[in-house]
């Protein structure tokens, strides 16, 4: 992944997360649980009780299913490198972009995205204990990312609320945003 996709895209600070606070990478946040959260059994059946965001799941084996750690800026750069827009050169073929972004029937995910409707934002959501994320790539090329370092108990409502916030912010401030390639090397 690093050799063929991330590094050619200019993304050098993506890493597979560790399972415990001691495994935290430089530049990685600390994850938090809600005050009502209770300790849970460690993923490896050790009998130890752990904080859910540090030891409930074996993150290192999740790989593409949520183990990656990256900043919002790095995620935007990756999206710009796989979106089929030639402002930032793509690191995947036009055929791969087309495959990943073809609109799917209701309740079916696109390849790598949750949804890729025509003339609306492409959507990718994700959550694990201790984090939630939302990535929107708009038809005008803007990419908006929101990442938390705590779990939300709102379920899918978290993404809906965040998308509504993004729309309000785009309407209010969109004309004030710079209209330029933010990833010029």
Describe each PLM feature range.
Residues 66-68, 128, 132:
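Gly/Ser/Thr-rich beta-alpha loop segments that engage phosphate groups in nucleotides
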Residues 132-137, 142-154:
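Short, well-ordered beta-strand elements
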Residues 1-121:
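Short, surface-exposed loop or secondary-structure junction motifs
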Residues 118-120, 128-130, 151-153:
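Short Gly/Pro-enriched loop/turn and capping motifs at secondary-structure junctions
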Residues 153-185:
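Short, gly/Ser/Thr-rich active-site loops of penicillin-recognizing serine hydrolases
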Residues 120-122, 142-143:
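Hydrophobic residues embedded in beta-strands of well-ordered beta-sheets
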């Amino acid at each position: 992944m690093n050799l063929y996709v991330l590094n050619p895209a200019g993304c050098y600070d993506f890493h597979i997360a560790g399972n415990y606070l001691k495994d935290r990478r430089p530049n990685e946040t600390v994850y938090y649980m809600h005050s009502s959260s209770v300790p849970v059994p460690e993923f490896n059946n050790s009998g130890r009780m752990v904080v859910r965001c540090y030891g409930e799941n074996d993150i290192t084996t999740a790989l593409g299913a949520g183990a990656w750690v990256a900043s919002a800026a790095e995620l935007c750069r990756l999206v710009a490198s796989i979106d089929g827009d030639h402002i930032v050169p793509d690191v995947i073929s036009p055929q791969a972009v087309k495959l990943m972004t073809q609109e799917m029937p209701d309740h079916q995910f696109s390849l790598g995205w949750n949804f890729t409707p025509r003339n609306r934002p492409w959507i990718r959501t994700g959550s694990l204990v201790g984090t939630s994320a939302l990535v929107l790539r708009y038809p005008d090329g803007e990419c908006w990312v929101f990442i938390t370092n705590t779990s939300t108990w709102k379920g899918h409502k978290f993404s809906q609320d965040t998308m509504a916030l993004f729309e309000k912010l785009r309407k209010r401030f969109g004309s004030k945003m710079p209209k330029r390639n933010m990833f010029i090397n």
